[in-house]
Amino acid sequence: MSDIDPTVRADPLPEDHDRALRPQMLSEFVGQAEARANLKVFIASARQRGEAMDHTLFHGPPGLGKTTLAQIMARELGVGFRMTSGPVLAKAGDLAAILTNLEKRDVLFIDEIHRLNPAVEEVLYPALEDFELDLVIGEGPAARTVRIELQPFTLVGATTRMGLLTTPLRDRFGIPTRLQFYTEDELFIIVDRNARKLGAPADEGGAREIARRARGTPRIAGRLLRRVVDFAVVEGDGRVTRALADMALNRLGVDHLGLDGADRRYLRLIAENYGGGPVGIETMSAALSESRDALEEVIEPFLLQQGLIQRTPRGRMLAQKGWTHLGLDAPRAQTDLFEG
């Protein structure tokens, strides 16, 4: 049961094209074993008690399934699902319009919740705690507060920047859940299943090659799979083999670690222009013509997880593994540092 109102939707999400590939129930969801096990308990408890499930916060890098899990929660709870995002809720009235239209126990999903307007956030507090909305009508001496009773609902927030959430908002989520990068085996299962759904079955080598280069992220795995299927249809026999996947991914500029051109430009900038670092994030942003947020949210998490770069108080540095991946020798001073 899913009611996505286009008037409260953000711009189309990158994964909207992969809707047919998304799992519909928790039992179909691969990965995030700890989060799934806990959510299963919380959903069952809410259903048995006939109450709205506690407010839930999903946080972690983009593309790990935050939106999908929120939709699954609503489906398994048997309630309606409404979706919006932090930047869209510019005024308190925008939030009030959504909250007053929620049915009993509905799930409201707010993506990028760390980007909520502070004025909107203040209105959200009593709604989360007491299911009441306090709105100020009028201005100056004639202003008065109107209290609106709301139906009990579940707010599901999603953020890639947990540290940017204010403490009062963060503390109002009873179920904070961190999503982790996926293992290669988990991504292999996802790729294998989705290849069949796309009508282009993959052999084990082909599916594993895509999984290996997907940066631990299902969204990226889905995107790479679609492109490899294009090559399989046009330049192959319709099947995704290891040789075809390797050829297609190399032509797409995705190397054996899953790094693309943007990642390699980032690493080469530190190596070739700044002697391996340290170099400040603002300098990196200007040199690469990328926003600081794009570097910190999209590029750096996987490079850090793979041990290719280091974050230091003085800036970013290339780790020994980063030099090795680029096929370059670290400067002598850095070599001594790594060995020491």
UniProtKB/Swiss-Prot annotation:
Root EC class: hydrolase
Function text: The RuvA-RuvB-RuvC complex processes Holliday junction (HJ) DNA during genetic recombination and DNA repair, while the RuvA-RuvB complex plays an important role in the rescue of blocked DNA replication forks via replication fork reversal (RFR). RuvA specifically binds to HJ cruciform DNA, conferring on it an open structure. The RuvB hexamer acts as an ATP-dependent pump, pulling dsDNA into and through the RuvAB complex. RuvB forms 2 homohexamers on either side of HJ DNA bound by 1 or 2 RuvA tetramers; 4 subunits per hexamer contact DNA at a time.
InterPro entries, alphabetized: AAA+_ATPase, AAA_lid_4, DNA_helicase_Holl-junc_RuvB, P-loop_NTPase, RuvB-like_N, RuvB_C, WH-like_DNA-bd_sf, WH_DNA-bd_sf
Native organism taxonomy: Bacteria, Pseudomonadati, Pseudomonadota, Alphaproteobacteria, Rhodobacterales
Organism whose genome encodes this protein: Roseobacter denitrificans (strain ATCC 33942 / OCh 114)
Family annotation (Gene3D superfamilies): 1.10.8.60, P-loop containing nucleotide triphosphate hydrolases (3.40.50.300), Winged helix-like DNA-binding domain superfamily/Winged helix DNA-binding domain (1.10.10.10)
Enzyme Commission no: 3.6.4.-
One cellular component (GO) term of this entry: cytoplasm
Name of the protein: Holliday junction branch migration complex subunit RuvB
Entry-linked Pfam families: AAA_lid_4, RuvB_C, RuvB_N
Region annotation (Small ATPAse domain (RuvB-S)) ranges: 183-253
